[in-house]
Each structure stands twice: as structure tokens, then as C-alpha cells.
């Protein structure tokens, strides 16, 4: 490991506090508002799917809101909306984040809902691909 790694230690010596430097470099309040909007939108959908049988959908019992095509659509939109956050979030340590920071809650919601939608969404893709194979074979 020592042949491939360099280790540095830095110390901020003057002119501003870490909090002030963070405020100059990132719009954390704006990012936090976008995280909160993401949570508001997707937590309602996640709860709705849980109430109407998301766990049943994972077991193969599809209710209207958890049909494979709908799960694929929801998962696609969820990923599309969330994917900008990892590029924008500086992943600062807790003491440098605003009080009530919603970034971690948004990440947990994304991971939980994304995983819950996986089974039915992936079945939908497999079914569509199989149908395409049948069409090609018949041509």
C-alpha cells in the first residue's frame, strides 16, 4: 500500500472559519430545499405503494399501483430526479451542515424505495425483452 498511496495532512491557518468557507463555496440552503422537495414528493408515493401492497408486489401479487410497468416507471423517475444530488452534495461532515439537514434522509428514502421497486421493475424489463425476442424470432 505504501508504494501506491501518499498521505497529506492540512491545516487551515487564517482568514475565515470553516463555516464561512463552506457558505462561500456551496449553496447548502438551496440544496437542502431540493432534498426536502424530493422527500415530500417521493415519501408520499412510497407510503402509498406500501399501503396498497408493495410487499405483495415483491412476492408476485400485483395491485394496480405496484404492477411491474408502474414500478418500472416510478423507479425510472425516482432515479432521474435523485441522480443530480450526488454530483451537487459536497458530503461535508455533520458539524458543517445546516441544522436539520435533509440529505441523509433523502438518500435513505431513495435507497429504500429504489430497492422496493427493483423486483417488479426488473420483471417488467425482462418481460419486454422476452417479448422483443419472440417478435424477432417470428420475423
Regions found by a protein language model. Give the residues of each.
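Long, contiguous binding/interaction regions
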Residues: 1-139
